[in-house]
Amino acid sequence: MSATGPISNYYVDSLISHDNEDLLASRFPATGAHPAAARPSGLVPDCSDFPSCSFAPKPAVFSTSWAPVPSQSSVVYHPYGPQPHLGADTRYMRTWLEPLSGAVSFPSFPAGGRHYALKPDAYPGRRADCGPGEGRSYPDYMYGSPGELRDRAPQTLPSPEADALAGSKHKEEKADLDPSNPVANWIHARSTRKKRCPYTKYQTLELEKEFLFNMYLTRDRRYEVARVLNLTERQVKIWFQNRRMKMKKMNKEKTDKEQS
């Protein structure tokens, strides 16, 4: 049995005898239920003979008074509050937002709320033809439903950094080829033949005229023709060789037709 309040009469009577009531009354003060018992004068000494003591006040350790710390302004920290429920057809924005000084307002948000908009494009010069104004306008911001943004194809702008990166990757792939691997060499093999340099119509016409006069050229004449046509001696020599082979083939076909 436990009692949270003052000791009840029943609990005291069951534990102690009535012979010690005077002793208990002098030790325990009376509660509101019982009248206050007067303490005997012998227990309290008389201090009227001693003079009263007076102490000099000590200087305060801290000169300034203790004041509560001022609360932080609401500008620094904004506690999260429940936002109003938006409908299914309400427009939404991306997560990388920046605050604007009232540039665009939304009817779904409270009047005192902060307005947000998407960051501007990283290439502002490409939007020079959008409008005459230099400030931000509604075409500069992108709004749309999730379905519209999902269906919209991403636009990639070519940049010199991307081209340089692609070229470096291509070079690394070439360097990774093993020269001892015949399969890789066969796949990436290139012809050692020089790039074909076709003759112009004027050069071909002059060479044909020279071929009609003489099927074989001397070294001096070949040098002169090459200088006039802005060609090398080797190019003139090869052209005459090919032209003689072509003429020989044409004569052989003509002879075969006559015999048949």
Swiss-Prot record:
Keywords for the protein's UniProt record, in alphabetical order: Developmental protein, DNA-binding, Homeobox, Nucleus, Phosphoprotein, Transcription, Transcription regulation
DNA-binding region location: 192-251
Gene3D superfamilies xref list: Homeodomain-like
Record region (Disordered): 120-181
Predominant place of localization: nucleus
Cellular compartments annotated: Nucleus
SUBUNIT field: Interacts with Geminin/GMNN, which inhibits transcriptional activity.
Record protein name field: Homeobox protein Hox-C9
Family: Belongs to the Abd-B homeobox family.
Database matches in Pfam families: Homeodomain (PF00046), Hox9_act (PF04617)
GO BP term, example: embryonic skeletal system morphogenesis
Gene Ontology CC: aggresome; chromatin; nucleoplasm; nucleus; transcription repressor complex
Chain positions with Phosphoserine modification: S159
GO molecular function, one term: DNA-binding transcription factor activity
